């Protein structure tokens, strides 16, 4: 192939010597160092507002709102949006409330929550929603209630309430 154009040759000027001193610029102040910002959560941000619905995801006909983890008991289980006796046979279920409103109540059969009675005070419990927002809780109290007092579960006043049958 033939070139379509030939580049022109230009003369490069030679630098000239300067005997006059050049002015030194005044230093500009540097900004003060600041602490490294905390990275934003990986999930979407949420507002702690009563009534806000937790996102869910359907898997095998059941809708899940997140995962409950209790490291000291070696427990990590999915949590279903709505409770029913059928759903309880699959996994723990939300009984009422929301992590977003600060009143989440989760119930489960003893084959999921059977070790709750051995959960130590000050143990850490986490709930991770379907958008990867992580809610950390610390165990402050353990109570036994009568089946007739189930209304106490929904109105416990706690950010998280975990419930199972006693053995």
Regions from the language model: what does each represent?
Residues 1-167:
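Solvent-exposed, non-transmembrane regions of membrane-associated and secreted proteins
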């Amino acid at each position: 192939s033939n070139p379509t154009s030939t580049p022109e040759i230009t003369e490069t000027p030679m630098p000239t010597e300067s005997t006059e001193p050049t002015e030194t610029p005044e230093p500009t102040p540097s900004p003060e160092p600041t602490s490294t910002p905390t990275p934003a959560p990986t999930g979407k941000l949420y507002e702690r507002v009563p009534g806000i619905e937790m996102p869910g995801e359907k898997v095998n006909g059941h809708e899940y709102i997140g995962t409950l983890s209790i490291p000291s008991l070696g427990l990590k289980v999915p949590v279903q949006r709505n409770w029913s006796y059928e759903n309880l046979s699959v996994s723990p279920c939300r009984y009422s409330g929301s992590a977003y409103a600060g009143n989440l109540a989760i119930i489960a059969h003893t084959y999921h929550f059977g070790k709750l009675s051995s959960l130590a005070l000050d143990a850490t419990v986490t709930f991770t929603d379907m958008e990867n927002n992580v809610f950390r809780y610390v165990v402050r109290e353990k109570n036994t209630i009568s089946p007739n007092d189930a209304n106490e579960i929904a109105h416990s006043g706690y950010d998280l309430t975990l419930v199972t049958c006693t053995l």
